[in-house]
Amino acid sequence: MFTEDINFEVLDFTNNKYENLKPELNFSAKNIEEAKSWQKLLKSKLIDLIGGLPKNREKLNSEVLKIEDFGTYTRETILFDSAEKMKVFAFLLSPKFIRNEKLPVILCIHGHGKGVNDVVGIKNQVTRNNFDGIHKNFAIQAVNQGYLVLAIEQFGFGRRRTQDHLDSGNESSSSCNLLSGTAFLLGETMIKWRVNDAMAAIDYLETREDVDLNRIAVMGLSGGGTTSFFTSALDERIKLAIISGYFCTFKDSIFNINHCIDNYIPGILKYAEMYDIAGLIAPRGLFVESATNDPIFPVDATKYAINKAKNIYESFDAGDSFSYEIFEGQHEFSGKGAFKFAKSFL
């Protein structure tokens, strides 16, 4: 017998494992009381799986390094602490055409690329206003629509990389693999660390007098969608989550397609699929967008997950709090439906 006659398709093994799973916390509630009880159980389990969350918030030690004027908005360069020896870099964009009132705020979280620069239009140290690249400078789009915007740099990207990546001259390189592996060795996850950064960002927003704390949204693309999704599931201060280029099923995305290790939570499929976790956001707002030709988060699986999430939202009598857009494109941000939904929701 020759080896070419033998089926060595390794994904047959892993997919068979998936098909035989019986997730303990798949949504099956028959009424709103059962749904609320289910939420508590899944939220507690999710916190355990990512490696826990701090019981006490870190002192922020925030500082504003610089304030710049860009005509229609100002940009503050900000630092704050999210954990011991963990400093977060961020930009805060404020619209100049709205004065003397508390504003709704969008926490903007970038995906893989050059870091926070990708959402605030910085390229080669020059700030632009054209909306190109996969991120389409969505933080600038948001401030132009009258939102206060806090755009944070995710751990492992941009300025927050290991020294070898900072010295490499490649602005798009990331330290995700090393740092995510380190997290696993410590019994934690990159998702935990990035969610904690995002929660600290909201802590920072709570210190500002120009923020309407009842109108906080989070918006993220790709790996930023990951952080936005899990932060919204775990932090009820967020009224609206806008998830771009991420919402799908685990099975059809990170389970079967090669992805950055920063996406993974060991053991999550023993308890829930991605659409179940969307139910932790209910009845708060959730808007998801997906491109027709996204190669790493397949749109057909996204449509399936959307239907599942919609059913969960309806169980909370919150069907109007969930919406979505499928648009023509690749793995990229659109925002057309998202900003329209945000205007009606915030």
Functional labels for PLM-detected ranges:
Residues I281, V288-S290:
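Short beta-strand/loop motif that positions the catalytic acidic residue
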Residues T292-F297, E332-F333:
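Acidic catalytic loop of the alpha/beta-hydrolase fold
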Residues E101, C108-N196, E206-T207, D252-I257:
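Cap/lid segment of the alpha/beta-hydrolase catalytic domain
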Residues I67-T127:
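Glycine-rich active-site/cofactor-binding loop and its immediate structural neighborhood
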Residues N307-L346:
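C-terminal catalytic histidine-bearing segment of alpha/beta-hydrolase fold enzymes
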Residues L178, T182-L185, A200, K239-A278, ...:
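Mobile cap/lid helix-loop segments that gate and shape the active-site cleft of serine hydrolases
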Residues D210-S222:
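Alpha/beta-hydrolase fold nucleophile elbow
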Residues M1-T74, S82:
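N-terminal targeting or regulatory segments adjacent to alpha/beta-hydrolase or S9 domains
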